[in-house]
Amino acid sequence: KLFGYPTGVGCLLARKTALSVLHRPWFAGGTVWGISVQGDGYIPLSGGEGFEDGTPNYLSLPAVTTGLNHLQTIGMDTIHERVRCLTGWLLDSLLALHHRDGTPLVEVYGPRSTRGRGGTIALNFFAPDGSLIDERVVDRRASASGLSLRTGCFCNPGAGEAAFHLSKEVLRKIFREEAKELLPGLFTGDGEVSWDQFLADLGMRSGGAVRVSLGLATNFADVYRFVQFAQTFLDTFPTERELPPRPHC
């Protein structure tokens, strides 16, 4: 999260007293002191070893040291201020974009200033008539322009539900009634499960949003280029057809 590499490496800091009261309902390789098939039992390792499944990604660990040293050389305060300034400029520039009739081009989810936010901006694009532009259209055009964006639904379902004003009653109805029909086909392969239909039943006009992430390596040319890309949607209606189906969230 701090410098983007390596992936698949992380750590959890926990007190020994806290670990001692945790009991895992399963186990995997490298987490047991002993195990028996005929005895139908196992004895877990104590401490952190009992929670480290498999072989640690030791080949990538030196990169963590190098990355942290690099951050220390630059200074976290400097990095924070730089990303804050880039994020603020990008937010102001995007929110200033309007179609010829005054309709806003984008809707930003979350704070519209740098107060209380990080360097990630989630947004959606809208056509001049106020209709939401499919995030798959944005993704396709961005890829053709050499821009790397994350589109669709993200890791925080609660924030997504709040952004799209989905009520608890609607969500409970969908998951209690429709999921009973969808899930068996998903797990058995007896029938196709349409995520697009699921979204339609929720009343959602989109599969999620467009996410722009700024960080250590981001420079002004990057955010300026994205604003130029966003401007290509002004006063236009997307004509893309045959968008790929959404297989899942």
Regions found by a protein language model. Give the residues of each.
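Pyridoxal 5′-phosphate
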Residues: 1-249
